[in-house]
């Protein structure tokens, strides 16, 4: 087995995104092309490549390639606890994900480099009449590297179809904090409130540099076929948060000791932390009735992970985020 590698060029990355949903059983009903513009056409085949590297006492955004609708401006150093870490906002010039969109994101973290990647706002997946949207993400973190991938929530609108595949290759001395938040549509908009999307399909796979699979998490959500509000799925909750922490084993027990499981039906919050296979890391899941509850749960796990792994805490959040 060979290790997951970064695509060599924009064309290869975009082709991976174009191929992603073609043979997916959950998308078999949605292979029709949009009449306005073909899937993956100009403006609908986004690409972003970010490369973080160490330069002296700090890290920099050493490489950036892009194709619309993706956009990144200069890296900022806003984290006072980690002033050596470049922080990058991913921006979409389209403002949302539309039917027929094919998106590819590649991130490379060089040895001993740091990086933080987030989005400028929530990612909205608009309603669709034809086809679907697909996203491929490839993340590679070399020896001693550290990456925080902390995007804002995803909001799948009524009738949307989305498939995403994330391939992670990580050195055993490196650390990745990978977060995702999925909301139940536009909660306070009558036409879109609740789980009314058609398909949300996700796969995340991590391997080492020898190609050994560390773990795979796969889920296909089809609320029109099976209610997500049933017991054992979302129950009474409306927002789902998921954080994957890949880090050396010596940190695991200390983090687990500080992350007590929680369930409070009155306030509407539930969370817990588990070990991933092959001693590669931990996974934290949190359910809430409101987005701020899930964000607070993720922020707690993020802060504890930082303190135990790096010996630094998390600064107070910006008042505008």
Curated annotation (Swiss-Prot):
Identify the InterPro entries for this entry: UreD
- Give a single Pfam family match: UreD
Main site of residence?
A: cytoplasm
Q: Which GO terms describe its molecular function?
A: nickel cation binding
Key word Chaperone present in the record?
yes
Q: Does the keyword Cytoplasm apply?
A: yes
Q: Which subcellular locations apply to this protein?
A: Cytoplasm
Self-association state and partner proteins as the record states: UreD, UreF and UreG form a complex that acts as a GTP-hydrolysis-dependent molecular chaperone, activating the urease apoprotein by helping to assemble the nickel containing metallocenter of UreC. The UreE protein probably delivers the nickel.
Instruction: Please state which protein family the record places this protein in.
Output: Belongs to the UreD family.
Function of the protein: Required for maturation of urease via the functional incorporation of the urease nickel metallocenter.
Which HAMAP family does the protein's record reference?
A: UreD
| Protein name per its UniProtKB record | Urease accessory protein UreD
Q: Which organism is it from?
A: Photorhabdus laumondii subsp. laumondii (strain DSM 15139 / CIP 105565 / TT01)
Q: Which gene encodes it?
A: ureD
């Amino acid at each position: 087995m060979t290790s997951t590698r970064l695509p060599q060029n924009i064309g290869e990355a975009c082709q991976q995104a174009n191929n992603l949903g073609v043979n997916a059983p959950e998308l078999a009903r949605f292979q029709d092309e949009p009449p306005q513009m073909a899937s993956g056409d100009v403006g609908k085949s986004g690409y972003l490549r970010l490369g973080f590297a160490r330069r002296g006492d700090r890290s920099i955004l050493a490489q950036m390639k892009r194709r619309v609708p993706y956009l990144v401006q200069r890296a900022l150093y806003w984290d006072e606890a980690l002033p050596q870490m470049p922080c990058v906002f991913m921006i979409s010039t389209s403002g949302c994900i539309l039917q027929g969109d094919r998106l590819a994101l590649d991130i490379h973290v060089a040895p001993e480099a740091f990086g933080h990647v987030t989005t400028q706002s929530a990612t909205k997946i608009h309603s669709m009449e034809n086809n679907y949207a697909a996203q491929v993400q490839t993340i590679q973190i070399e020896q001693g590297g550290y990456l925080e991938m902390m995007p804002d929530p995803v909001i799948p609108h009524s009738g949307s179809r989305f498939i995403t595949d994330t391939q992670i290759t990580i050195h055993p001395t490196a650390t990745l904090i990978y977060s995702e938040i999925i909301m139940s549509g536009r909660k306070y908009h009558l036409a879109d409130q609740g789980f009314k999307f058609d398909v949300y399909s996700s796969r995340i796979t991590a391997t080492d540099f020898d190609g050994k699979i560390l773990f795979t998490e796969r889920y296909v959500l089809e609320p029109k076929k099976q209610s997500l509000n049933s017991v054992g799925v979302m129950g009474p909750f409306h927002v789902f948060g998921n954080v994957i922490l890949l880090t050396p084993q010596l940190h695991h027990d200390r983090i687990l000791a500080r992350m007590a499981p929680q369930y409070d039906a009155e306030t509407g919050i539930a969370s817990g932390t588990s070990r991933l296979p092959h001693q590669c890391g931990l996974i934290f899941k949190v359910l809430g009735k409101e987005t701020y509850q899930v964000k607070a749960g993720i922020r707690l796990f993020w802060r504890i992970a930082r303190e135990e792994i790096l010996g630094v805490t998390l600064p107070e959040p910006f008042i505008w985020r």
